[in-house]
Amino acid sequence: MKVLNLGSKKQASFYVACELYKEMAFNQHCKLGLATGGTMTDLYEQLVKLLNKNQLNVDNVSTFNLDEYVGLTASHPQSYHYYMDAMLFKQYPYFNRKNIHIPNGDADDMNAEASKYNDVLEQQGQRDIQILGIGENGHIGFNEPGTPFDSVTHIVDLTESTIKANSRYFENEDDVPKQAISMGLANILQAKRIILLAFGEKKRAAITHLLNQEISVDVPATLLHKHPNVEIYLDDEACPKNVAKIHVDEMD
């Protein structure tokens, strides 16, 4: 597991955007696992700049989002469909829509939708890179504490802490969906390479637990210790004291 403090959200996001760009440039049929939320805004902004500057052919790139709120239509401003369109797919409108995969949070039968999305993941095979954030309680995707390590795509009851943390995106806390559809922990670990981003003081405790705690369902992110190729990029505020700062221009 590689852990790097790149000083700021902007610097870390730029570095990871370059990694995604290089993957798409050198592997035009690559499969990318994507994440959403406040952590990822600079990442997509930087990635869009790189894509527009170089007019990269992404017609054969496939994307797979981690999760979606249950009960929100794709057109809802707080849905992750809407987020991905606003942050990436409308900013660089050359991704092939048939290769964009995001769970449907407004399906009539959500358990059937979870099974359907899991089938897509299995049929498409390993993602080349999986992008992750981390919740204040150590969740990855929407896999809350207590989620079995062998879980696949499923419907999640969101914890009070997750609802409270996400309420800043809604008019009030009561508007935050109480459930989500999420890749399971087993799905996440199927990726060839995992890149986790964490920014801000509120994420420091979760990162500290991830790095120092034994593998436990109480902190789902600790499962990443079982994966052979994990990279964690932090800013100063999220970084535990024992992780040294490094500048992007010092990296390979």
From Swiss-Prot:
GO molecular function, one term: glucosamine-6-phosphate deaminase activity
Top-level taxonomy: Bacteria, Bacillati, Bacillota, Bacilli, Bacillales
Free-text function comment from the UniProt entry: Catalyzes the reversible isomerization-deamination of glucosamine 6-phosphate (GlcN6P) to form fructose 6-phosphate (Fru6P) and ammonium ion.
NCBIfam families: nagB
Active site, per annotation: 67, 137, 139, 144
Pathway the protein acts in: Amino-sugar metabolism; N-acetylneuraminate degradation; D-fructose 6-phosphate from N-acetylneuraminate: step 5/5
Name of the featured protein: Glucosamine-6-phosphate deaminase
Family: Belongs to the glucosamine/galactosamine-6-phosphate isomerase family. NagB subfamily.
Keyword list, A-Z: Carbohydrate metabolism, Hydrolase
